[in-house]
Amino acid sequence: MYKRQIHTTADFDYAQTLHFTPGAVAAGIAAMHAGATIITDTNMALAGITKPGLAKLGGQALCFMADPAVAAAAKQAGTTRAVAAMHKAAAEYPGAVLAVGNAPTALLTIAEKIENGLRPALVIGVPVGFVNVVESKERLFAVCESHGVPAIVAMGRKGGSNVAAAICNALIYSAAEMLDPTARGWK
């Protein structure tokens, strides 16, 4: 996991800032083996996920940010599309892997949903930036830990859609290699 993040970003800080709840990597690999649906908060993260490898495991990756219904729901509720997209993800794919690389508001929505009973297979929380990023990551990690929800979170200000995709790919490649050690990630 660390290797893929460092390779993706050329940033060795991920060896210290990437945090895992107990069993998070195993839960992520198990989700991939079970044909996970991965929901991202950006089309950029979606584009970075290896679709052939995920499809061979029976999974799919989706992003609702460009969904007209999500835009309408966000406008009606006076919130962001990221929040509305996570509401849709929770309603339609409650056991999905949620991969957030951009929107702290998405992390806060996921944390609230978990407190109200949502149990995603895994939450990947790696938004990048300055506004509410650190706080949203810390809250998400604490909520996931206290509710037994697997999570991988890049603490601090670093992260991004590329990091979210790289974590997803590390899980996909690990799952593929467990099924066939010669597969080398099924690229």
Walk through the language-model features, giving the residues of each.
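Conserved small/polar residues in nucleotide/adenosyl-binding loops
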Residues: 1-5
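Buried hydrophobic positions in well-ordered alpha/beta secondary-structure cores of metabolic enzymes
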Residues: 41, 123-125, 167
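Short glycine/serine/threonine-rich phosphate/pyrophosphate-binding segments
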Residues: 45-48, 104-110, 130-134, 160-164
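Long, charge-dense
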Residues: 54-93
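Feature captures the catalytic cores and cofactor-binding loops of soluble hydro-lyases/lyases
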Residues: 92, 106-123, 127, 132-135, ...
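C-terminal functional extensions of proteins
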Residues: 131-187
